[in-house]
């Protein structure tokens, strides 16, 4: 397994442990974070990811899990395939969808993230 894959695996491990400081420490200072749903990092950097993505998800959902099942690496690019699940805090609806996450690693830190997910299923759980 490559160092890049191990780094991304460490990120998911930190999320599963609800250890946001450890997850954020794995990111480059100017990380670019791109999502397909309404949670957005409104700038570059770990603080923007925390404020625009991670904190809102944890506030809006319970039983949150990002569970990777496969990692594919090519140099500094890592793709993780897995499932996102959770229960929406207001509607009490459960979502369980597949995702593809594309990561770029530079200098031993996460430089970029792109998310691909079933946005309709997530949106339906929110209403």
Set out the residue ranges of the language-model regions.
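A solvent-exposed, acidic/Ser-Thr-rich amphipathic alpha-helical stretch
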Residues: 21-24, 28-76
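Hydrophobic pocket/interface hotspot
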Residues: 8-11, 23-24, 31, 49, ...
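A beta-strand edge to alpha-helix "cap/lid" segment located at domain peripheries
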Residues: 3, 54-127
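Short, mixed-charge, low-aromatic patches
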Residues: 5-14, 36-40, 57-61, 81-83
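Short, low-complexity N-terminal intrinsically disordered segments enriched in polar/charged residues
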Residues: 1-29, 126-127
């Amino acid at each position: 397994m490559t160092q890049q894959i191990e780094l991304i695996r460490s990120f998911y491990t930190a999320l599963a442990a609800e250890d946001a400081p450890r997850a954020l420490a794995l990111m480059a200072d100017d990380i670019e974070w791109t999502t397909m749903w309404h949670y957005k990092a409104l700038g570059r950097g770990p603080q923007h990811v925390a404020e625009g993505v991670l904190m809102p998800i944890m506030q809006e959902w319970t039983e949150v899990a990002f569970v990777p099942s496969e990692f594919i690496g090519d140099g500094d690019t890592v793709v993780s395939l897995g499932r996102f699940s959770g229960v929406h805090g207001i509607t009490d609806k459960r979502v369980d969808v597949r995702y593809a996450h594309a990561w770029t690693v530079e200098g031993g830190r996460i430089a970029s993230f792109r998310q691909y997910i079933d946005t309709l299923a997530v949106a339906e759980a929110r209403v």
